[in-house]
Amino acid sequence: MARSLKKGPFVDDHLMSKIAKLNETEQKQVVKTWSRRSTIFPQFIGHTIAVYDGRKHVPVYITEDMVGHKLGEFAPTRTYKGHDADDKKTRR
């Protein structure tokens, strides 16, 4: 179910304050975060945010198209290695 419009989008305060500080000083640094639930705001555009996927931080460069999505959408947590190509030989 989608979030109620009257509540507005969610972003963790610590992440927003880090981005605001970088925007004031006009620095470009990688910001590490564990907050996959945070919504991407227009202030994030042009920054690289390292989102934790359960074992490492995945660097995500924020573009205009990503605004409104969640950070976790761009750091997949599961690795799919694929099925065995020739499964018939093992069944005989």
Swiss-Prot record:
Pfam families the UniProt entry points to: Ribosomal_S19
One Gene Ontology biological process: translation
InterPro entries (UniProt xref): Ribosomal_uS19, Ribosomal_uS19_bac-type, Ribosomal_uS19_CS, Ribosomal_uS19_SF
MF GO annotations: rRNA binding; structural constituent of ribosome
Keyword RNA-binding found: yes
GO cellular component, one term: small ribosomal subunit
Domain of life: Bacteria
SUPFAM superfamilies reported in the protein's UniProt record: Ribosomal protein S19 (SSF54570)
Keywords recorded for this protein, A-Z: Ribonucleoprotein, Ribosomal protein, RNA-binding, rRNA-binding
Signal peptide extent: none
Family: Belongs to the universal ribosomal protein uS19 family.
Function (record text): Protein S19 forms a complex with S13 that binds strongly to the 16S ribosomal RNA.
Protein name as catalogued: Small ribosomal subunit protein uS19
Native species: Bacillus cytotoxicus (strain DSM 22905 / CIP 110041 / 391-98 / NVH 391-98)
Lineage: Bacteria, Bacillati, Bacillota, Bacilli, Bacillales
Gene: rpsS
